[in-house]
Amino acid sequence: MQKKLIAAAVAGALVAPAAMADGHGVAVSGSIRTGVEYTGDDWQVADNYSRLRFKASSDLGNGQSAYMNYEFRVNSAQGSIVTGDTQRLSYVGIKGDWGSLSLGAQWSTAFNTVGTFIDKTNRYGGTGNTCIQYRMKNSVMLSTQLGGLSLMADAQMSTGGDTLDRGTVGGLFSIGGLSLGAVYQSADADCMGVAAAMNIAGIGISGGFTDTDGGDTGYGVNASIGGLWLDYETNDSSDGVITGSYGLGLGGGAKMILEVSNNGDDTMGIGMLRMDF
């Protein structure tokens, strides 16, 4: 009985805030992603970055609004919350017709403009993103839209580091079926990248190039048709990595995903059930 009461209390705690703050657009969502993985040496039941998310927004008047996002990573294979730096997203911001300003741990300008064209994997990608941060902690970001041109910039200011650890500017431009992205980052090791994507006769093609000042260059290309997706990524310090993925939607937010990857030495793979809510 006590366990049932606790479960009911937890469920009520999740639902009640959304109902009480409906005027502020509170929403609870997330994704659970669990599969059976072959690591190259062994088989295991593994989590694939499951998460629980809380979002809210509030109308400030004059076309302005405030918004926030809390996201917690969950290890669905072990039934635990995963802690540590930049496990998921956590930010607060203000937006209007002029654009948006946000602070916290958020998707970086480098990933939004270039990295996302290179790495579209569910688990095994990223070799070509030599100097691309995915989620960036201790960051402030400004973005705006000028017609078909999206401009964004961010700065990372971590405790104990330099006053400005990284400063990044980037942009996205779309014309017809072609999308282009570019980024430049000033850091201890400067970074630049370019990327593009287009659709030809139902086949989606994308890719990009990254270069680290005094370090590695890397690139990746990928193609998709229907639920099938193929990717090749490489950089100066590693062999090429080939990854293939197939996703089958089951309805109701559920999806079956099979992904296999080979880095020239080992083959890894995961068969995963994902459900978004």
Q: What do these predicted regions represent?
A:
Residues 1-277:
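Outer-membrane beta-barrel proteins
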